[in-house]
A protein has these predicted regions:
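Active-site nucleophile-His-acid catalytic modules used for acyl/amide transfer and hydrolysis
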Residues: 236-311, 572-574, 644-646
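Repeated loop/turn-to-beta-strand initiation elements of outer-membrane beta-barrel proteins
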Residues: 466-473, 480, 508-516, 552-562, ...
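Membrane-embedded beta-strands of outer-membrane beta-barrel proteins
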Residues: 458, 501-503, 543-549, 587-589, ...
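Transmembrane beta-strands of outer-membrane beta-barrel pores
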Residues: 447-453, 464-466, 486-493, 505-507, ...
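Outer-membrane beta-barrel "beta-signal"
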Residues: 460, 648-660
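N-terminal accessory segments that precede or flank the first globular/catalytic domain
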Residues: 42-220, 370-507, 551, 593
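Transmembrane beta-strands of outer-membrane beta-barrel proteins
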Residues: 441-443, 458, 481-483, 517-523, ...
């Protein structure tokens, strides 16, 4: 080392030049540390103040906080658990089960200096509803907790331009397990929108994230939380097209009476839930349940979810909302395309209907003399119906003619040449809304006589509706029952016994005409009594299915009489059967007629030949009556004759049905 070198090996001149620069660097570093220390200490002090205040106020116990975090009480053990299953929704390690530590972790996150980008949000924005509520309770000091601009949220809310919220109920769609009870979603109504422009609003939907097309697989996985459910937002007209046009489901729109702050609170929470998912359960934690939780966040003073501990049927959840004082503003009915077409068919005679059908398929030209022979209003009605039906068929994915678009233009052109209005009355809304129908659960108290023995019976059904129930608020011809059961006590030696248990029974009786030709079908599985060769009646497990046709026929009572025919098949399994099983098939016929608005009667005849295993020929026929006392009470009278194992017996039963 040279004598004029510094210990670091630098020439002395260079060292003398760099030394001031190094001193300046050290000065700034020490100054920064001096500033950070007090700032960090100040943050810790303010966080400690907020935490202490939140504990004093017991904020973690407040209903508002528990709703924001989707906590629900444990079924057996004390405490709560959060329903959200996305890992980043709860910030504390034990935040899913500890509202207090989650609140304190949330407070700590609000001091984050993270800047908002397209991919990242500051916690004040990511959990904007939590921030707003805690700010209301604790009064955050902007000088001690800098507020972050939430530009992405503000832009999203401005796009929605919210003025109101409507609860939307598409009616039941029996051919889709996820919608066989109906469905609910929310619509954010924008400012300056009316009934004609509501289609441009946005809808908030909760559904299972799956592309599963097998209904049985979907139902099984949905029963056990096999799918992740999440919220999504899309233009309302897309949902209307899906429900009204493709699935032939009428839509009820319930405009809610929410204030501007309540709407804002709801939207802030929806923003928080954007990336969050929940385990989807078919019966309870489903679309309707989580929409109720959104409404509870919007208006914390209401309790909508506590009654739906075990199952949440969409119609029941709508009923729960409507029952809240001052919640409902008005309703609007939006008929499906199929309903509109059926309405038009009711205004025409047979020849006009046939002509419209043939025109829609291109089998008859718009210039056909049979059309021009009609009065101008009838010509217009025929062409409009042909055009509507053509578009309906196209929307369902079928191609009725080689060039449907060209035929549609031709029909529009022909209609434009007729200077006459149809003056058709609009489709009338059903007299009974879905929220005004009978309760979806039912208990029946009955007494009767079977094969010479008197009995009393208790029958229960958690959900939903059968063919003999009053149709108001439900789809006629659709039966959906889960876990129906009957218990009887007989006089004499038989005593008390379980008569039947049916975990699932679904029947769709869909009438056909020239325009609509659906198949009717049945499916049920469960345990029922079957008489065997020794005269005993074991409880036998079986699976039963059927397919058939149904029609509406004129009747003298001015009601809709339904006639149907099925080919049915049954498989039964029990060790007491010959060979341990029985396979059978056979026909069934039925008719259903409403004698008055309260009185329904139905008759049926079913025969099956069991050709494998425990062979037998069985017959069953009967007459059923139902008289409605009020919305949730009805009387039933059932008379039947059965034959099994060459033995016959009669049964008579009278019951009081209670719906709730």
């Amino acid at each position: 080392m040279l004598g004029n070198d510094t210990p670091s090996g630098e020439p002395l001149g260079v060292f003398l030049v760099n030394r001031p620069i190094r001193l300046v660097r050290w000065f700034w570093l020490l100054s920064l540390l001096a500033l950070i220390g007090p700032a960090h200490a100040a943050t810790n002090d303010y966080l400690a103040e907020l935490t202490a205040k939140s504990r004093t106020l017991g904020l973690h116990e407040r209903r508002e906080w528990n709703r924001l975090l989707h906590y629900t009480k444990n079924l057996l053990l004390p405490g709560v658990h959060g329903l959200a299953d996305a890992p980043r929704f709860y910030l504390a390690v034990d935040g899913k089960t500890n509202p207090q530590t989650e609140l304190e972790a949330t407070l700590a996150s609000f001091f984050s200096g993270v800047e908002e980008t397209n991919q990242v949000q500051n916690p004040q924005c990511q959990f904007i509803a939590r921030f707003a509520w805690l700010d209301e309770q604790l009064g955050f000091d902007p000088a001690r907790m800098p507020r972050r601009a939430c530009k992405r949220f503000e832009e999203w809310r401005d796009t929605l331009n919210p003025q109101g919220v409507s609860l939307i109920f598409p009616s039941a769609y029996i051919n889709n397990p996820s919608s066989m009870y109906g469905h609910t979603l929310l619509r954010i109504d924008g400012k300056d929108q009316d009934e004609k422009t509501r289609l441009l609003a946005y809808a908030i939907n909760y559904a299972a994230n799956t592309n599963e097309t097998n209904g049985v697989v979907f139902a099984i996985k949905g029963l056990f939380g096999g799918y992740a459910g999440a919220f999504s937002m899309m233009p309302y007209y897309l949902k209307v097209r899906e429900y009204n046009d493709l699935e032939n489901r009428d839509i009820w729109e319930y405009e809610l009476n929410l204030t501007a702050p309540e709407i804002d609170r709801l939207l802030m929470h929806v923003w928080e839930l954007g990336p969050v998912w929940f385990d989807y359960y078919f019966f309870d934690e489903n679309c309707s349940y989580y929409l109720l939780e959104l409404l509870e966040v919007a208006r914390p003073g209401i309790d909508l979810t506590s009654r739906f501990r075990w199952w949440a049927i969409p119609a029941d959840t709508v009923r729960a909302v409507v029952e809240q004082q001052g919640m409902l503003k008005r309703t609007h009915y939006r008929p499906s395309n199929a309903t509109l077409i059926q309405h038009r068919l009711g205004l025409m005679n047979d020849s006009e209907r046939s002509l419209a059908f043939r025109i829609s398929l291109g089998r008859v030209e718009p210039e056909d003399p049979r059309l021009s022979a009609l009065p101008a209003p009838q010509q217009a009605r025929v062409l409009e119906l042909g055009y509507d039906y053509l578009n309906y068929v196209r929307a369902t994915g079928r191609k009725p003619v080689a060039e449907p678009a060209a035929l549609a233009r031709e029909l529009l052109l022909a209609r434009s040449r007729i200077d006459a209005a149809t003056d058709d009355p609009p489709v009338a809304a059903p007299e009974v809304r879905p929220d005004q129908g009978h309760g979806t659960s039912r208990l029946a108290f009955a007494a009767g006589r079977r094969d010479g023995a008197n009995f009393v019976e208790l029958r229960g059904r958690p959900t939903y509706h059968d063919l003999m129930d009053a149709d108001g608020g439900y789809a006629r011809g659709a039966q959906i029952e889960f876990f129906d059961f009957g218990v009887r006590h007989y006089d004499g030696d038989i005593g008390s016994r379980m008569e039947d248990v049916t975990p699932v029974r679904i029947i769709s009786i869909a009438p056909r005409n020239e325009f609509f030709q659906p198949l009717s079908w049945k499916f049920d599985t469960g345990w029922a009594r079957r008489r065997i060769a020794d005269g005993s009646e074991p409880l036998v497990f079986g699976v039963h299915g059927a397919t058939g046709l149904a029609w509406v026929v004129p009747d003298p009572f001015r009601s809709t009489t339904l006639v149907y025919a099925f080919i049915e098949s049954t498989a039964q399994v029990d060790q007491r059967l010959d060979s341990g099983f029985a396979l059978g098939a056979g026909p069934s016929l039925g008719v259903q007629c409403d004698l008055t608005s309260r009185w329904r009667t139905a008759a049926y005849l079913t025969g099956q030949r069991f050709f494998a295993g425990d062979t037998d020929t069985t017959w069953s026929g009967g007459l059923r009556q139902r008289y409605t006392l009020d919305t949730n009470h009805a009387l039933r009278l059932d008379l039947s004759h059965d034959r099994q194992e060459k033995q016959s017996w009669n049964t008579a039963l009278i019951a009081l049905d209670w719906y709730f």
